[in-house]
């Protein structure tokens, strides 16, 4: 009887030891793998942009013996271990070891998290916005206060896929508009990519903005930090009140700056969509940063482009025609990113996709059917979007050219351009006829009467200034104007910008126009919405190569 008792005790000890061993090595993986995956199904690496999913999937399973597990720091020499390229100066020093391998709390309100390699703490606090289909948790990496930890299941993701993302981050992320890569950790089950934390994605931001615009309060999530930011920022113009370089356009300019940096380094992103643009919030200032370099391609060596890959790149509804048509004779190059940016810009400006609903986008892109382009009313935006969505890749502007477009000029630059255009036109009488005959009807309308658009109060003030007071000489900026002449309208804008303290000294006029330059820009843009692009095209045709306009075109 006593022999049976000893045997049962021994068996119980073995069971307890096995259970403890399992809990230490495997149990915590549930923190970053909450939903059990079907091993027989095609593995999901990530979700795509606004609605679709990535067409490119990876199916190779990693060797379970590989990695840098907490209990297996000495790995098999034959196992593949992901690494940061040694020639990249990303982490000059290895992150400091955490004090203990035991579980720690991310903060007082959180349950214990998982420690990886004594350097990374992965909390159980999953990030609410900007995950793009991945499992992303808040974490602490070494002494860094906070990182976003992108968790990739090694059973469903190849080492090559992850290594490509790491290599591209190391090559390209030294820029204010590319999400920063802080490091890589790995255990037997997961690879952990440590990234700069963010507030939300551009997709989250636009959808929340659209809901607020439509006052669909029932669909809005409970108030959080993101909504607090949204309430204080006007992302789009109010009806009838144009806001040049609105916060949303500033975010779009951030994206172009990031693309220009990638293209300068001969890297194609290949998957630009609203979910892959992340928003950083600091002191109520928003910055857009490009993320997800997993499908990016570096054009190394002497090659400037590469043929279409065997599997389609990018996300459904957010691919260029050359990416969708699978024409091996055509090359996927930087213009593909610019087409994607054109779709992104339309989505940011209007809250809609230029090629329609999710189910019809790919077909419309293939057939060049821009169903929603007519919804755009801003002429600067229409002009740029049409160029970016050109079916022929060679006719799309580059990222550096897009940065020079008037859509991304601030009020001061817009007014300075009109002033220099006015000075140049005044010097060349041969330009007057073409300006008033061809351009004026599109700017002023058939009546060619710009005085009526400015209002009686404003015009009366201008006319009073033109009449010299007794004993005073009439100054040049007080000369009378011909209200049918577009050249004289440009002269008026030029004079107000150069002498606004004298011309806008009347309190009523100052209140009407607002501050210079923002208020003055809005005042004239609201009344003559075609003015900027028409004069821009006119000067581009006649004076583009002149030194005075070099900063606007080159």
From Swiss-Prot:
Signal sequence, start to end: 1-17
Keywords: ATP-binding, Nucleotide-binding, Signal
GO MF term list: ATP binding; protein serine/threonine kinase activity; RNA endonuclease activity
Name of this chain's protein: Inactive serine/threonine-protein kinase/endoribonuclease IRE1-like
Segments of this protein annotated with the region Disordered: 36-85
Sequence positions that bind ATP: 150
GO CC terms, sorted: endoplasmic reticulum
Domain spans labelled Protein kinase: 121-408
UniProt similarity note: Belongs to the protein kinase superfamily. Ser/Thr protein kinase family.
PROSITE patterns (alphabetical): KEN, PROTEIN_KINASE_DOM
Domain KEN: 411-554
PANTHER family: IRE1-RELATED (PTHR13954), NON-SPECIFIC SERINE_THREONINE PROTEIN KINASE (PTHR13954:SF6)
InterPro entries in UniProt: IRE1/2-like (IPR045133), KEN_dom (IPR010513), KEN_sf (IPR038357), Kinase-like_dom_sf (IPR011009), Prot_kinase_dom (IPR000719)
Biased composition (Basic and acidic residues): 51-63
Comment on protein domains: The protein kinase domain is predicted to be catalytically inactive. As the kinase activity is required for activation of the endoribonuclease domain, the protein could be inactive.
UniProt-listed GO biological process terms: endoplasmic reticulum unfolded protein response; mRNA processing
